[in-house]
Amino acid sequence: MRVSTPALIATHLGAVAVGWAVTDKRPVDEQVKHTGFFQIDTTKVLATTVESLRDENRLLVFSYKGDARVWTERTKWWLFGGRQELSVPAVVNYYVDLSDLTLADVSFNETAKLVTVRLPKLTIGDVAFQLENSTTINGGLLTWDDDQVEAMRKLNYVSARRAMVAQAQQTGLINAARRRAIENVSNYFEIPLRIAGRPDVKVIATFR
């Protein structure tokens, strides 16, 4: 099993920080403006960061590369049979839908100097097969029929997709993706806070 984790994109992080420092002139959202915990400058930083993250829509946080090995058999008139084996590598991406993030998911404790962010649930993207690296082995009389070969190919790819989704849902991979999401989003909030002169504020992200 091979796992690859996409590096945090520095340009995106810079965009969040610069977006706050240069362009933000909007009033603070009323739902947090009068909570009694937020200082106005910190609130503006957090509000702008949330909007920037929402603009990201789906944030890619983790990728898994695996291999599906499946096979299928067919018979015709109880006399002729065919078998096809398929081995195909594929990549599955993990996302957090940040368009669902709101200021209600962000809280700030000035005394503890702590920002808490509640993240939307982790989602898994579609399976991206690497067809150029796939291997197919056909056997049996039915494999002389191109239509039968194509029918078995379609069945095998359905099975391969299911196999990859099952692999991607393993607890170890889900936990790794969640950890990466927490690290990425925490960094998204910490950088503009540091620029705003609040390096003392710690950010903790958790899932809802």
State where each predicted segment sits.
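Domain-level marker for long, solvent-exposed, non-transmembrane regions
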Residues: 2-208
